Regions:
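Glycine-rich phosphate-binding loops that contact phosphosugars or nucleotide phosphates
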Residues: 97-100, 104, 113-211
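Extended, charge-enriched "interface" segments that sit outside catalytic cores
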Residues: 1-111
Length: 211
């Protein structure tokens, strides 16, 4: 790194250790000597803040699907419209309770043992987000091992099934299917592959039939 680059980072970054948060805008078009009184910022900041307020208030951000952008409401449900905030808090509580039941063995496979694996089936952000969390925060102390069907490549899914087999098999694996729309064809393909693996257990007399 050159002295000029380091100087620019120092001039155009700010740290808030108590959060913790570091904001670095040194790679933007802002001049090194930029100040909050500059016309560029005087125009940009109000527009950015009003746009953020509109999104947080539930404005339609995807007109094609008539969808709002509220994923950050999961982290701060108090920002969501009242009825949505309550629904988010109740849903998060149910998810946490279900996870606790899986960890404790209250929700368990037919073998009577606990689930040791989770297979997540999803495409795009539906799998990329969980993969990021698993890679960033996972450790050897995790109670469940994570596996992913994140595309429709048959060889890729076969390799992941081999990894699951080496980790105790599909009979000890809880499968989670994630789709924003509920109708993603690629996700359905992965779900059918997982379903076929469970059906094979039934054929082998190692499980009960399911729909």
């Amino acid at each position: 790194m050159t002295d000029a680059s380091l100087s620019r980072i120092r001039s155009l970054s700010a740290a808030a250790p108590s959060v913790p948060l570091l904001v670095d805008v040194s790679r933007t078009c802002l001049p090194t000597h930029a100040k909050t009184s500059d016309p560029l910022l005087l125009e940009a900041f109000p527009a950015a803040f009003s746009g953020m307020a509109a999104l947080e208030g539930g404005a339609i951000a995807n007109p094609d699907e008539k969808r709002r952008v509220g994923h950050y409401w999961l982290r701060a449900p108090e920002l969501a419209p009242e009825h949505l905030g309550q629904a988010i808090e109740e849903t998060v509580a149910r998810v946490k309770a279900f996870a606790a039941d899986v960890h404790s063995g209250k929700v368990a496979p037919e073998s009577g043992k606990r689930f040791t694996n989770v297979l997540l089936v999803g495409i795009g952000g539906s799998s990329l987000g969980p993969q990021l969390v698993a890679d960033a925060l996972g450790s050897g102390e995790d109670k469940l091992r994570l596996f992913f069907f994140d595309n429709t490549d048959p060889d890729g899914m076969a390799r992941e099934m081999d990894r699951i087999a080496a980790a105790g098999g599909i009979r000890h694996t809880l499968t989670v299917v994630v789709s924003k729309s509920g109708g993603t064809k690629e996700t359905r393909n992965g779900m059918l592959v997982a379903q076929a693996a469970y059906t094979a257990l039934v054929s082998a007399g190692l499980g009960e039939a399911f729909n």
